Design a protein with these regions (language model features):
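Glycine-rich cofactor phosphate-binding loops and adjacent beta1-alpha1 units
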Residues: 152-153, 204-271
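Mid-domain Rossmann-like dinucleotide-binding core that forms the NAD(H)/NADP(H) cofactor-binding site
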Residues: 131-209
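Short glycine/proline-centered loop/turn elements that form peptide/ligand docking sites
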Residues: 84-85, 185-195, 232-233, 256
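C-terminal capping/lid region of NAD(P)-dependent oxidoreductase domains
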Residues: 2-5, 298, 302-311, 322-341
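Residue-level marker of beta-strand positions
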Residues: 93-94, 110, 247
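C-terminal substrate-binding/catalytic core of Rossmann-like NAD(P)-dependent dehydrogenases/reductases
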Residues: 262-312
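Glycine-rich beta-strand-centered segment in the early N-terminal region that forms part
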Residues: 30-48, 59-102
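A structural motif shared across PLP-dependent enzymes of the aminotransferase-like
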Residues: 102-114
């Protein structure tokens, strides 16, 4: 097929407040050339995550970048070219993926992405419905099964701190569909309480008084905690609630330290989850992300998982992406926002 030599993208050269005119700008770039393991994808929809806002704010905090940086770490699109070592994909296939934080992102008409972190998109979902799922599903899956090492058949308890966001919602759904865990999730507003209940949480508690809220449910300790909201702010509560020999995982970095020795008496563990680790370090098991997305797509098509789409923005412009970033930065969003190109 005939492809253009250039493409439109939205990027930035300065880390500015999203309300400022040049916080995101429209640019023209050369069409990416796929590497030997790459798919070249014509992007049809994508989604914005907190990672996008963090990278935009930090990448050029004290400098102006020589070349615009393009972010975007969720996408659905059509394969239009591929590298010589790609297997399992053909031109014309519809795919979805989160991508690689070290490479240009999906805020562009075309994107080159490693086929080992890509899967065929769910057949029953629209582009917008599918676009909101890769990053949060991969994060939730890795946290549950790779970091916390949950065994699907064990009847234990999981506390999700930050249940109404994308990762929290995915964690609740996956845990309830694929394990025997009792899931407790935090929510602090009526609308978020309703949402996490719809996601499948067995108990909904308020994070403002976390220990007492959990224990009011008749639960003294929890076997697993996944924090997707505030690691340092909830540290003492997590230490109090974690069961002896339990495990805590988090995706939220923090300034300063926490006292890990508080976990020593319980022989409890703490482990980070970063969805980009496998692609960042080109790990030997990088293809596991393709395998996870394959299973997520099947679960979505079977109706066992629900898309987290709550809003769709339409059009490819800097203003549309700014609106999506404002939604994320408000910290009050429920579910996820997609951008339909």
């Amino acid at each position: 097929m005939s492809l253009p030599s250039t493409m439109k993208a939205v990027g930035f050269t300065q880390s500015l407040a999203i309300e400022q005119e040049n916080s995101l700008v429209e640019i023209t770039l050369d069409l990416p050339k796929p590497g030997e393991h790459d798919l070249l994808v014509q992007v049809t929809a994508n989604s914005i995550n907190p990672a996008d806002a963090k990278i935009r704010i930090r990448s050029a905090a004290d400098k102006t970048l020589e070349q615009p940086k393009v972010i975007g770490y969720d996408a659905v699109g059509i394969v239009v070219d591929k590298g010589e070592k790609v297997s399992g994909f053909n031109i014309g296939d519809r795919v979805f993926y989160a991508g690689d934080v070290t490479r240009p992102g999906s805020n562009a008409e075309y994107q080159a992405v490693d086929h080992r972190i890509t899967a065929h998109a769910p057949k029953s979902l629209t582009d917008a419905e599918a676009a909101v799922m890769p990053l949060v599903s991969l994060t939730a899956w890795e946290a549950l099964f790779d970091r916390l090492r949950v065994t699907p058949t064990e009847k234990k308890t999981l506390l999700v701190i930050g249940g109404a966001g994308g990762v929290g919602s995915s964690t609740i759904q996956i845990a309830k569909q694929l394990t025997n865990l009792t899931v407790i999730a935090t929510a602090s507003r009526p609308e978020t309480e309703k949402w996490v209940t719809e996601m499948g949480a067995d108990y909904v508690v308020n994070h403002h008084d976390l220990v007492n809220s959990v224990r009011a449910q008749g639960i003294e300790h929890v076997d697993y905690i996944f924090n997707v909201a505030d690691t340092k702010g909830h540290w003492d509560a997590m230490v109090e609630l974690i069961a002896p020999q339990g495990f805590i995982s988090s995706i939220v970095e923090f300034d300063g330290g926490v006292d890990l020795s508080k976990l020593q008496g319980k022989s409890a563990g703490f482990i980070w989850e970063l969805m980009f680790t496998r692609s960042l370090f080109q790990t030997d098991d990088m293809i596991k992300q393709q395998e996870i997305l394959f299973q997520i797509a099947n679960l979505l098509d079977a109706g066992r998982l629900k898309s987290l789409l709550t809003e769709t923005l339409t059009g490819f412009s800097a203003e549309v992406f700014k609106t999506a970033h404002q939604r994320i930065e408000s910290s009050r969003s429920i579910g996820k926002t997609a951008i339909q190109f």
